[in-house]
Structures are given as structure tokens and as C-alpha cells.
Curated annotation (Swiss-Prot):
Record-stated family: Belongs to the 2S seed storage albumins family.
Gene3D superfamilies reported in the protein's UniProt record: Plant lipid-transfer and hydrophobic proteins
Cysteines paired by S-S bonds: C4-C49, C17-C38, C39-C87, C51-C95
PANTHER family, per the entry: 2S SEED STORAGE PROTEIN 1-RELATED
Task performed by this protein: Heat stable 2S seed storage protein having sweetness-inducing activity.
Coiled coil regions in record: none
Subunit details: Heterodimer of a small A and a large B chain linked by disulfide bonds.
GO molecular function: nutrient reservoir activity
Organism, as annotated: Capparis masaikai (Mabinlang)
Record keywords: Disulfide bond, Seed storage protein, Storage protein, Taste-modifying protein
UniProt protein name: Sweet protein mabinlin-4
Amino acid sequence: EPLCRRQFQQHQHLRACQRYLRRRAQRGEQRGPALRLCCNQLRQVNKPCVCPVLRQAAHQQLYQGQIEGPRQVRRLFRAARNLPNICKIPAVGRCQFTRW
């Protein structure tokens, strides 16, 4: 886990993924440049760390207070869990983490 935290920091806290997740949670937007950049960032992360860093990215959005209400929180975490599939990252598939 400390290794994954370090990866999270090395890859600019997956900023593009955070941007994508925020838009997805707030407006349900699925496309756009943030997604492409996010997938590029995710592909550079060690496979075992993909889900942990996505969980961190989702939490970062929560802490920044950008996500409002249970519906947006649900959408945020659902989107984060699905990103490895959307980005077609081999051998990761859907992340299993829950909100905490």
C-alpha cells in the first residue's frame, strides 16, 4: 500500500482521472479529453496499484468537497471501479473496493 501511495504521488495524483471522476459524478459525462489522459496515466501505474490509486483519486475528490449528496458519491465510486475496464487495462478488470 505505501508503494501504491507513492505511485499515486508520482503520477500527479492521477489528476486527469480526478477530473474525469468529478465530471462523471456531477454530470454523468463519459467522454472527453480527461478520460483519454486518465487512461494514459493509469497505464503507467503498476498493475497491483491500479485499484488502490483509483480509490485514492476518488477519495481526494470527496475530501475536496466537490461531490455533493449520496447520489454523486455513488456515481463517483462506481466510475472509479469501472475505469480499468473503460481504459482496457489488461488483467485488472473491475475494481472491488467499496466507498471505504
